[in-house]
Amino acid sequence: MPVGKLVFNQSEPTEFVFRAFTTATEFQVLLFLLFLLLYLMILCGNTAIIWVVCTHSTLRTPMYFFLSNLSFLELCYTTVVVPLMLSNILGAQKPISLAGCGAQMFFFVTLGSTDCFLLAIMAYDRYVAICHPLHYTLIMTRELCTQMLGGALGLALFPSLQLTALIFTLPFCGHHQEINHFLCDVPPVLRLACADIRVHQAVLYVVSILVLTIPFLLICVSYVFITCAILSIRSAEGRRRAFSTCSFHLTVVLLQYGCCSLVYLRPRSSTSEDEDSQIALVYTFVTPLLNPLLYSLRNKDVKGALRSAIIRKAASDAN
């Protein structure tokens, strides 16, 4: 599908506006402050992870390599959505051009898909570390880690580009359509098309299965082997700590994949239109906030590196 047709499918330009969360001014201010606080926490938490991994040689292992890239994805992922969302909460609705909507959709889908593939890669990394500890450094080489990360981005990039191009070659009715969402996501934009969208829905389901179902199954298989390995640990304290870590990781995975599946894989209905934007808040704010907390900030190595970095920074400022 030629990308050049992305914006020129109409004889006249079309723009979209996002439906407001609420028209009550006091609630607008409250929502703005809440989402701004969550966004700043996401920025601080994920930036801290990237900084500490890049500045401490002891954390330059495959696990922390993937964690830092996950944090970078979360930063980009939320930044594509949240600033525009915040600007629309307060004041009058601001229209977004067809090209701007297409760009936001492309980056949102690409980064979100890469995130899903990366979570599967991280589960495989943990499987190798726990089930094959003696061969971990031989298997998880720097070259393999880089190739897997590039593969995740490539697998996300191609279908995202094709899906976005396919959607924005559709005709849209009128020149000032309202999107029943806080971002240019695929399902709400598809509903605005003035054409038969059954083929586009089928493509969306195929892409969703590729991005959501397959990585989730790989994660489940990895954790089945990890669980079997944990059960063989003789120390009760060791088993408890391992299960505690795995349960937190699986909580984030189930939350992200479950919410995304509800939006992209369930049949379309009139009730799902309003529910989609509410569910999307979970994987826009909650999982990007939980990932640095549960994957890294609970880790003793990361906390120790952060503590030593802060002490060194304070000492250098004092001198």
From Swiss-Prot:
PANTHER family (alphabetical): OLFACTORY RECEPTOR
Cystine pairings recorded for this chain: 101-194
Positions in the Cytoplasmic compartment: 51-58, 125-143, 223-242, 298-319
Stored SUPFAM superfamilies: Family A G protein-coupled receptor-like
Keywords: Cell membrane, Disulfide bond, G-protein coupled receptor, Glycoprotein, Membrane, Olfaction, Receptor, Sensory transduction, Transducer, Transmembrane, Transmembrane helix
An MF annotation (GO) of this entry: odorant binding
Name under which the protein is recorded: Olfactory receptor 10Q1
Membrane topology: Multi-pass membrane protein
The species this protein was found in: Homo sapiens
Localization per record: Cell membrane
Transmembrane intervals: 30-50, 59-79, 104-124, 144-164, 203-222, 243-263, 277-297
Residues listed as glycosylation sites in the UniProt record: 9
Database matches in InterPro entries: GPCR_Rhodpsn, GPCR_Rhodpsn_7TM, Olfact_rcpt
Family the UniProt entry places it in: Belongs to the G-protein coupled receptor 1 family.
Pfam families cross-referenced by the UniProt entry: 7tm_4
GO cellular component: plasma membrane
Gene coding for it: OR10Q1
Record topology, Extracellular segments: 1-29, 80-103, 165-202, 264-276
Function per UniProt: Odorant receptor.
